Design a protein with these regions (language model features):
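Ankyrin-repeat and related helical/solenoid repeat scaffolds used for protein-protein interactions
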Residues: 162-205
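Ankyrin-repeat boundary/"N-cap" motif
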Residues: 32-44, 65-81, 100-107, 128-138, ...
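Ankyrin repeat A-helix N-terminal signature
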Residues: 44-49, 77, 81-87, 105-111, ...
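Leucine-rich solenoid repeat scaffolds
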Residues: 79-86, 91, 95, 194-221
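Ankyrin repeat domain, specifically the short helix-to-loop turn at the C-terminus of the second helix
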Residues: 57-63, 92-99, 119-125, 150-158, ...
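TPR-adjacent "capping" and linker segments in tetratricopeptide-repeat scaffold/adaptor proteins
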Residues: 25-33, 94-98
Length: 221
């Protein structure tokens, strides 16, 4: 999932951004050498295409923190794209190149100590959202770190439990799926951006134990 078209003029900007966190701020500067299409292409590549990210960044280092505007309020950088789809290789590469570590990316990477530190420093960070308004909990679910997910949920990051379930099922994290189903009240029949339910994904990926668990709790394909 790479964002949504809203029928408004798209914009490509470079910004200093801690966009996922509550204390977010923006410094936007238009860069004449970067076209809107180029920034959009780079951000889309950030959703898991490491080879393309490497190539584009080597040719245009200014793309690193380039942000594409899907709408007037929905900006996305390549590392935010990597964080929302759970692409560890892309996120780690962009961090190595100097991209800012946002709390959503830290959660996706399973950096529990870093996430906890940021929430201690600013409790409002528990309500952080990434690109497209995706909450913190689904990002953390990509990591498979049950303790991290439990910590976030206990401290108020309970939005996005259905998306978190989808991510856990996609990765085959059985223990995390069990915990989410029993504690986080996800919609077991919610559909992802491909129109698939968690049970459909489990069956498609031949995750029989997860599929059995979901059926026991009333999930449908």
């Amino acid at each position: 999932m790479t964002g949504r078209e809203h029928g408004i003029p798209a914009r490509a900007v470079l910004r200093t951004v801690i966009g996922c966190e509550r204390e977010s701020y923006r410094v936007q500067t238009t860069n004449a050498s970067l076209s809107t299409d180029m920034v959009r292409e780079f951000v889309i590549a950030g959703h898991g295409n490491l080879e393309k990210v490497r190539k584009m960044l080597e040719e245009n280092p200014e793309l690193l923190n380039g942000s594409y505007a899907w709408s007037e309020t929905d900006y996305e950088t390549a590392i935010q794209g990597a964080a929302q789809v759970g692409s560890v290789p892309v996120a780690e590469y962009l961090l190595e190149k100097g991209a800012p570590l946002e709390i959503c990316a830290a959660a996706m990477l399973g950096q529990k100590d870093e996430v906890e530190r940021r929430i201690r420093d600013n409790p409002d960070n528990i309500n952080s959202k990434g690109a497209h308004g995706i909450p913190l909990l689904p990002h953390a679910a990509w990591s498979g770190d049950l303790e991290l997910v439990q910590y976030l949920f206990r401290n108020g990051a309970n939005a996005g439990s259905s998306s978190a379930l989808h991510n856990a099922v996609t990765r085959g994290y059985y223990d995390l799926v069990v915990w989410l189903v029993e504690n986080a009240s996800p919609d077991l029949n919610s559909k992802n951006f491909q129109g698939k339910t968690p049970l459909s994904v489990a069956i498609e990926r031949k995750q029989e134990t997860i599929a059995h668990l979901l059926r026991e709790h009333g999930a449908n394909e």
